[in-house]
């Protein structure tokens, strides 16, 4: 139809020209066309990142160095988010600070948006959170015991007195120390307390819970056995 279509190269802007030739009746004439290609802002390109941290340990992630903008615009982080069960993320001094949720370990995925001040792009950061062994804790305090001489044997459930977020019931090992006359046997976390015949007095018993890694916690219970007339 006699029209000419000019298409600049990708992302080119500036001066350009082309020459076209018109032929009529065997006579040709060339004409140069000057073109000014005005710049148009291009969106930045955000690139995915990876990071590693330990359980309960915040990590600072510099995500911008591998993000690009062909126009040379200065990039910044506009926003960032992470599922709440995995942790929290903040933007601090142009970097992401990820704090894992308490006792969380595994893979966390942060989504962030980078901007050149006008246009944006999104990328993700995969954070590998390494598991760290947690020490068992005292879940409930064992009360001091006041008993009568030759008391009837009874039991204390150590599974409810101690807990470990890393281990389910049955994975803690229980022990007792400090007893000579208050007899204790422990099976499946149940401590059976028995008397020594005709004994009375006081003893401080220390119950200890240890996890498979050897980390442990203890609590002491004072046993007082009152004399009874025979």
How should each PLM-predicted stretch be described?
Residues 9, 29, 42-83, 101, ...:
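Extracellular ectodomain surface segments
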Residues 22-27, 114-119, 209-215:
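Short, solvent-exposed loop/turn segments at the edges of extracellular beta-sandwich modules
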């Amino acid at each position: 139809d006699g029209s000419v279509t000019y298409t600049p190269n990708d992302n080119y802007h500036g001066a350009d020209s082309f020459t076209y030739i018109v032929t009529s009746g065997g006579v040709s004439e060339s004409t140069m066309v000057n073109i000014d290609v005005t710049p148009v802002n291009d969106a930045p390109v955000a690139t995915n990142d990876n990071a590693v941290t330990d359980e309960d340990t915040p990590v600072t992630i510099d995500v911008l160095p591998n993000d690009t903008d062909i126009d040379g615009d200065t990039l910044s982080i506009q926003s960032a988010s992470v599922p709440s069960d995995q942790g929290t993320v903040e933007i601090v001094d142009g970097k992401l600070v990820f704090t894992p949720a308490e006792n969380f370990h595994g893979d966390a995925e942060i989504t962030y948006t980078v901007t050149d001040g006008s246009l944006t792009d999104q990328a993700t950061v995969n954070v590998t959170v390494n598991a760290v062994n947690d020490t068992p804790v005292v879940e409930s305090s064992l009360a001091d015991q006041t008993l009568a001489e030759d008391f009837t044997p009874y039991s204390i459930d150590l599974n409810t007195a101690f807990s470990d977020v890393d281990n389910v019931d049955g994975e803690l090992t229980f022990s007792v120390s400090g007893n000579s006359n208050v007899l204790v046997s422990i099976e499946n976390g149940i401590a059976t307390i028995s008397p020594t015949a005709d004994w009375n007095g006081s003893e401080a018993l220390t119950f200890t819970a240890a996890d498979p890694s050897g980390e442990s916690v203890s609590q002491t219970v004072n046993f007082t056995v009152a004399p009874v007339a025979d």
